[in-house]
């Protein structure tokens, strides 16, 4: 059931971030991503409160990404990890290039 919940939300040419809005790391990750202008439908924020039991979802995250914590961030169907991973990419000034290369940013 957790697999279906996650896989239905992942797609090529899309950024998906699984969050808990009470989590400061999730809010920080959203702040980074919200600096960019995404094409309609190319960016989805999923509150993990939508899924019960939460532990089942976290177990599935661990199975496919190696981590149970949120945020869990996916570029297409590929996990890039969590907040610290996103921050590292952003600090290298590579995030915009990566997002452009997967076709999720507006060009105008």
UniProtKB/Swiss-Prot annotation:
Molecular function, one GO term: glutathione disulfide oxidoreductase activity
Domain Glutaredoxin: 3-106
One Gene Ontology CC term in the entry: virion component
Organism expressing this protein natively: Cowpox virus (strain Brighton Red) (CPV)
Pfam families hit by this protein: Glutaredoxin
Function summary: Has thioltransferase and dehydroascorbate reductase activities.
Record keywords: Disulfide bond, Electron transport, Redox-active center, Transport, Virion
Cystine bridges: 23-26
Classification via InterPro entries: GLR_AS (IPR011767), GLRX1 (IPR047185), Glutaredoxin (IPR002109), Glutaredoxin_euk/vir (IPR011899), Glutaredoxin_subgr (IPR014025), Thioredoxin-like_sf (IPR036249)
Alphabetical list of PANTHER family matching this protein: GLUTAREDOXIN-1 (PTHR46185:SF1)
Signal peptide range: none
SUPFAM superfamilies recorded: Thioredoxin-like
Induction section of the entry: Expressed in the intermediate phase of the viral replicative cycle.
Cellular localization per UniProt: Virion
Domain of life (superkingdom): Viruses
Family: Belongs to the glutaredoxin family.
Main location class: virion
Protein name (record): Glutaredoxin-1
């Amino acid at each position: 059931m957790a697999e279906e919940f996650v896989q239905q939300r992942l797609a090529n040419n899309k950024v998906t971030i699984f969050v808990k809005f009470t989590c400061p790391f999730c809010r920080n990750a959203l702040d980074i991503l919200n600096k960019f202008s995404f094409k309609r439908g190319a960016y989805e924020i999923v509150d993990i409160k939508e899924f019960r039991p939460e532990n089942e979802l976290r177990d599935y995250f661990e199975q496919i990404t190696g981590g149970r914590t949120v945020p869990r961030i996916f570029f297409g169907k590929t996990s890039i990890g969590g907040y610290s991973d996103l921050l590292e990419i952003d600090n290298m000034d590579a995030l915009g290039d990566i997002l452009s290369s997967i076709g999720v940013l507006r060009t105008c």
